[in-house]
Structures are given as structure tokens and as C-alpha cells.
Amino acid sequence: MLLAVLLQSAAAAGLGKLGAALGAAIAVIGAGIGIGKIGGSAMEAIARQPEAAGDIRMNMIIIAALVEGVALIAIIVCLLTLFL
């Protein structure tokens, strides 16, 4: 009986670490894809309207920072899940 309880707790701890690692990986992949799409769209917009390059670049940096902030929060939540 005690062995079964110990094995279940060990398995639960291992799955928690796996889940935290997968969550962090998905957050980073999502942020990379999002920032890549933002950069690509901004370059297309600058190619179409070179005179608006300053405004487009400013908006691109702000949106990329927001996407990166969401990814950072997701990684922090995964780390908290891992260690707490």
C-alpha cells in the first residue's frame, strides 16, 4: 500500500515537470511565431509605404513587446508550477 502511494506521488511529480516544460516550450514557440509574423507584416507595409516607416516601426516594436510580455508571463507561470 505504501509503495503504491509513493509510486503515485513520484509519477505525479514527474508529470508536473513535464507539463511545465511543455508549457514553457509552447509559450516560447508561440512568441517566436507571433513576432515573426509581426516583423514580416511590418516589412511588407514599409515596402508598400516607405514614408510611413517610422510609425510602422514604432507600432511593430510596441506589439512585439506585448507579445513578448505575454510569453514571459507564461514562462513565469510554468516555472511557478514547476517549483511550487
Swiss-Prot record:
InterPro entries with a match to the protein in the record: ATP_synth_csu_bac/chlpt, ATP_synth_F0_csu, ATP_synth_F0_csu_DDCD_BS, ATP_synth_F0_csu_sf, ATPase_proteolipid_c-like_dom, F/V-ATP_Csub_sf
Annotated site, Reversibly protonated during proton transport, chain positions: E68
Membrane topology term: Multi-pass membrane protein
CDD domains per the UniProt record, alphabetical: ATP-synt_Fo_c
Assembly and interaction partners: F-type ATPases have 2 components, F(1) - the catalytic core - and F(0) - the membrane proton channel. F(1) has five subunits: alpha(3), beta(3), gamma(1), delta(1), epsilon(1). F(0) has three main subunits: a(1), b(2) and c(10-14). The alpha and beta chains form an alternating ring which encloses part of the gamma chain. F(1) is attached to F(0) by a central stalk formed by the gamma and epsilon chains, while a peripheral stalk is formed by the delta and b chains.
Keyword entries, A-Z: ATP synthesis, Cell inner membrane, Cell membrane, CF(0), Hydrogen ion transport, Ion transport, Lipid-binding, Membrane, Transmembrane, Transmembrane helix, Transport
Transmembrane segments: 21-38, 60-80
GO CC aspect terms: plasma membrane; proton-transporting ATP synthase complex; proton-transporting two-sector ATPase complex, proton-transporting domain
Organism: Phocaeicola vulgatus (strain ATCC 8482 / DSM 1447 / JCM 5826 / CCUG 4940 / NBRC 14291 / NCTC 11154)
UniProt protein name: ATP synthase subunit c
Protein's cellular compartments: Cell inner membrane
Lineage per the UniProt record: Bacteria, Pseudomonadati, Bacteroidota, Bacteroidia, Bacteroidales
Keyword Transmembrane applies: yes
GO MF terms, alphabetically ordered: lipid binding; proton-transporting ATP synthase activity, rotational mechanism
Function: F(1)F(0) ATP synthase produces ATP from ADP in the presence of a proton or sodium gradient. F-type ATPases consist of two structural domains, F(1) containing the extramembraneous catalytic core and F(0) containing the membrane proton channel, linked together by a central stalk and a peripheral stalk. During catalysis, ATP synthesis in the catalytic domain of F(1) is coupled via a rotary mechanism of the central stalk subunits to proton translocation.
Record gene name: atpE
Similarity field: Belongs to the ATPase C chain family.
